[in-house]
């Protein structure tokens, strides 16, 4: 099966680099699924975003991503984000509190984190 080389980088650290068969995310133009040999593109990610990466024979990766950009070539997907964290790193109760914040940036980050842990769609 064809695979993509995928890299997720936040301002403060490299989050993940590896191979995947499919990547799902949300851009300012709408939801998008990326398969190998996708048309090259660049897109801005929404602030309350969750990236899901399907991998052959392994559990899907779910990453909460705060803003940033997506760059796609036929063989590679790069995500450059303000911040990002794996679902396993997220405190769901703290994310719920953030999602209820009056500050729109904090609320967006909380929603992204809740999407990553599967608490909301």
Swiss-Prot record:
Pfam family, one: ATP-synt_DE_N
A single cellular component GO annotation: proton-transporting ATP synthase complex
Membrane topology: Peripheral membrane protein
A GO term, aspect molecular function: proton-transporting ATP synthase activity, rotational mechanism
Disulfide bonds: none
Domain of life: Bacteria
Entries under InterPro entries matching the protein: ATP_synth_F1_dsu/esu, ATP_synth_F1_dsu/esu_N, ATPsynth_dsu/esu_N
Protein's job: Produces ATP from ADP in the presence of a proton gradient across the membrane.
NCBIfam families the record matches: ATP_synt_epsi, PRK13442.1
Subunit architecture: F-type ATPases have 2 components, CF(1) - the catalytic core - and CF(0) - the membrane proton channel. CF(1) has five subunits: alpha(3), beta(3), gamma(1), delta(1), epsilon(1). CF(0) has three main subunits: a, b and c.
Identification of the protein by name: ATP synthase epsilon chain
Source species: Mycobacterium leprae (strain TN)
Phylogenetic lineage: Bacteria, Bacillati, Actinomycetota, Actinomycetes, Mycobacteriales
Gene of this entry: atpC
